[in-house]
A protein has these predicted regions:
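Surface-exposed interfaces of beta-sheet-rich extracellular modules
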Residues: 1, 36-67
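Well-ordered beta-strand positions in beta-sheet-rich domains
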Residues: 29, 65, 76-78, 151, ...
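Short proline/glycine-enriched turn/loop motifs at strand-loop junctions of beta-rich domains
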Residues: 13, 21-22, 45-50
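Small-residue (G/S/T/A) turn/hinge positions that recur once per unit in extracellular repeat modules
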Residues: 21-26, 30, 56-59
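Conserved "repeat-terminator" motif of extracellular CCP/Sushi domains
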Residues: 1-16, 64-84
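Long, domain-scale functional regions
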Residues: 2-11, 83-402
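Surface-exposed coil/turn segments at beta-strand junctions on protein surfaces, enriched
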Residues: 11, 33-35, 45, 61, ...
């Protein structure tokens, strides 16, 4: 029998509302007909990203458009945006809220501190650094050839936004936080032997020209790098534009720039005046001579961190997390030339437990510890931690490094 009645719906359609936790929605309510779709413009708040943690109505997200399809009844829906993972650089600035003025560099700075960053300038850009006995500049990043986790201390940020790290071995309590011992150069009787790389001998001008020869210590560092960080595919996380300064400037062919700044004037700098002394892996910011983006800490960086020429200074670069020497009794090399005199080339070093954090110099043929320095790219993200020894910052591993 054919039905003799029909039902007519005079309603205005189905009401669909949407709320967003950690973001905004526009409009908040839409009315649609049977079987139609409702689309909303959604925007995450700062610190959150266009990915959903909760999605009560099963809608789809494409860019900033959230769509609920095939609507057959009224709905009240909600979504929650995921927290975005901050870069290590951004996390540092968020966590370290104290910005004291370092002031004079004429005395050591060894006091304990947390949540503290000091500011300076590199190439006209504000950079941030740790000083004194900072307790919260620990990073866990990478593994060595034996698959052991590697630990580092944050030295500072760089003008390219990368974060500079000092090697601390395979634990925060390490007393052997160096990759081995080495001479800086195997010969000492030429001014060129203060160079990390050089062309020929006889003068600094010669050393700076056609720099194809590696120092002894650079060979040690590069070999370690290829066997460990490169072999484990960590190169993609490292800045190629960060500058490692082997400052060979000299006005008298005796004392080099860092010696004058730190001994006479007490005025450290992060700037590197001469392009040939700016060791980089990318030629856009320096000499582009490094095959691998890794080198050493500078004497100026030690001064910023609390050190003082020819003084003990047990600061963060000296200590491990157990408040002992991170290198035991072993002194360790810096990248900065000190002086050339009496037929002997000298480079800066830092003292071990017998001379805690003592900033001094050594003949380049001396045997001292090698503590590599790397810089994590500005886009590298942290996956957790607060920088303490018990919860070091960890790095989010990705396909591209960012």
């Amino acid at each position: 029998k054919t039905p003799d009645y029909c039902t007519i719906d005079f309603g205005d359609g189905y009401s669909v509302s949407l709320t967003a936790t950690n973001g905004t929605v526009s409009p908040s309510n839409i009315t649609v007909g049977y079987g139609e779709s409702a689309s909303f413009t959604v925007t995450p708040n700062s610190g959150y990203k266009l990915e959903l943690e909760t999605n009560t109505c099963g809608g789809t997200l494409s860019g900033n458009t959230y769509t609920i399809s095939n609507i057959t009844s009224g709905k009240s829906c909600s979504i929650t945006f995921k927290s975005s993972t901050p870069t290590l650089y951004a996390k540092l600035l968020t966590d370290k809220t104290k910005r004291p003025n370092r002031g004079s560099f004429s005395s050591i700075l060894t006091s304990n501190n947390t949540n503290t960053l000091y500011t300076s300038i590199e190439n006209g850009t504000t950079v941030y650094y740790f000083a004194g006995n900072a307790q919260d500049n620990w990073v866990k990043f990478g593994k060595n050839a034996s698959n052991q986790d590697l630990y580092w201390r944050i030295i500072r940020t760089n003008s390219d936004g990368s974060v500079r790290l000092l090697y601390h071995g395979t634990s925060t309590t390490a007393t052997d936080a160096y990759i081995g011992t080495s001479a800086f150069n195997s010969s000492y009787d030429n001014i060129a032997y203060v160079s990390y790389m050089y062309g020929s001998t006889g003068s600094i001008a010669n050393a700076r020209t056609n720099q194809t020869k590696s120092s002894t210590i650079k060979g040690v560092i590069d070999n370690w790098y290829t066997s460990n960080l490169e072999a484990k595919d960590y190169t993609k996380y490292l800045s190629r534009t960060a500058v490692y300064c082997n400052d060979r400037s000299t006005s008298d062919n005796k004392y080099f720039g860092a010696r004058t700044r730190l001994d006479t004037n007490k005025t450290p700098t992060y700037d590197c005046a001469t392009i040939e002394d700016k060791f980089t892996a990318d030629s856009s910011t320096g000499n582009g001579k490094l095959t691998y983006p890794i080198a050493l800490m500078t004497a100026d960086e030690v001064s910023f961190a609390g050190g003082l020429y020819e003084n003990n200074a047990p600061t963060w670069y000296y200590y491990n997390s157990a408040n002992g020497s991170s290198t035991g009794d072993t002194w360790w090399w810096l990248l900065s030339p000190d002086y050339w005199y009496g037929g002997n080339a000298h480079v800066f070093v830092v003292g071990g437990s017998s001379y805690p954090g003592y900033l001094s110099f050594s003949y380049v043929i001396g045997t001292h510890g090698v503590r590599p320095v790397i810089s994590l790219k500005s886009c590298v993200k942290t996956s957790g931690g607060d920088g303490s020894a018990s919860a070091p910052y960890t790095i989010e591993e990705t396909e591209t490094g960012c």
